[in-house]
Amino acid sequence: MITPVSGLALAGDATDAAKLAKSYQLWGGIRTNHVISSSGSFVDQLGSSRGLSTPEDLDLLIELRKLADLVVVDAATARNEKYKRLSHAHLAIVSASGDFTSIPATSATDKVTLFSEAKPTVETAGVDHHQIASVDPFRQILLWAKGLGMSSILVEAGPRLTKICFETTKVSQSAITFTPKLPRNAVNGSMNPFSPSGELVSLAESTDASFTLWSY
């Protein structure tokens, strides 16, 4: 059960993940998505975000993917989270080194594209690959996506690639889930690890998480 608190969530009477995602509305450009612990960590002790997530957060992630044309993830996250081909959106996996080993999605025959500066270190037959500059990958990914008519991009990367995304491109929004739930008066710009100037446009909560949407 999700309780809408303010902004878009409250206006949309978002009492579950599907309604919350719908209240966020469609977007153009880049929306980033993250789950973060109250201490600011992006991963658990096993190096995965799954240990931080909650059932409602996972449901929200699925709903946000349904609204996206393209999901972008770094290879390390795709490996740790065992990413597979997505049912709704196209999946782009980014690696500076070209290491795409142990990622289930690389066995897909469609809807998956690999991006790296170096050539892939493993055989990825049937999967499209593009060589790009690792210092500014998003500019090239955006051009590629635009050419294919993809306008709504969801970035699910870790903090390093997300930081590059903010430095080199225009990010429209960030959907950030905090676990466990934060006191309502503690949800402010200082909690946003990417841009303290972001405007909080939506707040909702469950028993163990705070769901926020920031606009830039």
Segments from the language model and where they lie:
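Enzymes that bind and transform nitrogen-containing heteroaromatic metabolites
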Residues: 1-216
